[in-house]
Amino acid sequence: MVDERAGVAEIIEHCLARGPIEWDAMNRHRAGGVVTGCLVEGTSMTLKAKLGRAPVNFGAAADNIGGQALEAVEVSGNEVTTSWSGIAGAGVGVAACLPQAPGVLRSEYPTEDDLRTGGARTNRVRIISPRYEKLCFGIDDTDTRTEGATWVMALRCAESCRIEGVEFLNMRLVQLNPKVPQKTTNCVGSALNFAVKPQNVADLKEYIRKYVEEHTFSSDTGIACYRGIDFTVDSTAFKWVKTEIMTLEQAEREAQTLGIEFLDRNAKKGRIGALGAVLWGNRGIEAAGLYGEHL
C-alpha cells in the first residue's frame, strides 16, 4: 500500500513460521535503506517504508549490516515496484519466496545470477505489484442497552465484503473514554482496515455506509473514514478521545483538520467514537487500553 501524500508505504507479509519473519525484520531494519519501522505479530510482519530509493548497509549479517534489505519503493501509475537484496538464505527469501506471493504481477532479476539461490550467493530482485491504498473505517454507537454489538456487526461487515480490488486487512477495538456520561456500556469503537485499489475506493465507502446503516440498532451511529497510511498533521484529538468529553462539534472540526471523512448521514454523537476508532485504528495494542495503559 502507498500513501503518496505522506510519502510512505506499508508492506504486509505472512510466513508459515515466526523465525523467517523475525530474522528478516531485524535485518531489514539494520540495513536501513527506505525502511522506517517494522512490527512483527506472530508469523506476520508490517514494514513501514518511505517512497523512493536510499543506500543500504547490506551484506553478511554483522554490526550495522543487514543480510536482507529493501532498497526502494517506487510508484508508477497503478504499479508499485519494491527493490530487494538478500544474501545466502536471505537471498532465497527475496529471490524465490517473495516473487511467489499472491498478487505479484511480475518479478525482474537484474542478472541471470540473481536467479540462482542458496549457498553464499547474493540475490537482487525487483517485485512489481498492483498499487493499493489504505482505508481505515471507524464505526461506533450501533447497539443499544438491549441489542447489538458494534464489534460483531463491524466484523461481519468486513468479512461480507466481496468487492474486487479490496482486501480486508484487520479489525481493531478502540477503547474510548469510559467516563463520558453518554456512551455504550464499554465505550468501545471498532476500526476496520482495508487495502484498496484506487478505482475501488468509492465502491468500498458506499458498501461500508450501506451495510452499517442497514444493520445498526441505533439512530446515533457514526461512520468515519481515513484514506492514507499516516496522518500528515498532529492533533490533540488522539488523546482527547480517550481522556476528555468531546463534543460533536469538536469531533467534526478535528476530523476536517486531519482529512477524516464522515460517511454516516446521522450527524449524531456516534461520530465522536467513530473518529476515535480511526485515530487509533493503526496504533497497536494500546488502542484497546485506557490512555497510557500498556501490557
Language-model segments: what does each one mean?
Residues M1-L295:
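Conserved mixed alpha/beta catalytic, RNA-binding, or beta-rich assembly cores of soluble enzyme
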